[in-house]
């Protein structure tokens, strides 16, 4: 290899590392930081804002730090020092795939882009394919700094409420406002852990 080839390889590796670890370079704006830090004192928090203002982005960021244990220096919000179980939820299976899953894992159905979402690719250790919408995941497994494995499952409001029953969770992320019966079912999943529900819509 020539020196030029070496430089090109280094630049390509740097670009790939940046692409596959968005968490490291993500810089929230003040209102997003305020939302994150509100999780310290409240069991339910909501961020309401207009379209394309970073609601889903910060929602995916919170899910990622909870799943990985990689909290930034500025973080004053809720902390989990153990692997977590959480749900990322939304209006429909397609909406969850195209928004929450995309923000967390990268573009759905494109294996070459898997791991370009908020969760560092190197920390995603498993995925369970869902039923229904092509490219949708049921669950992803993520390495936590404690050494254990966190799980993030994807749920939608168009599922029967019974699909929201029976599981104990540490956190619940509702991206878009949920129907009350689904939200209450989600809150019931948090009782045993004194968990957190956060919503972005």
Description of each model-found segment:
Residues 1-201:
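Phosphate/NTP-binding elements of NTP-utilizing enzymes
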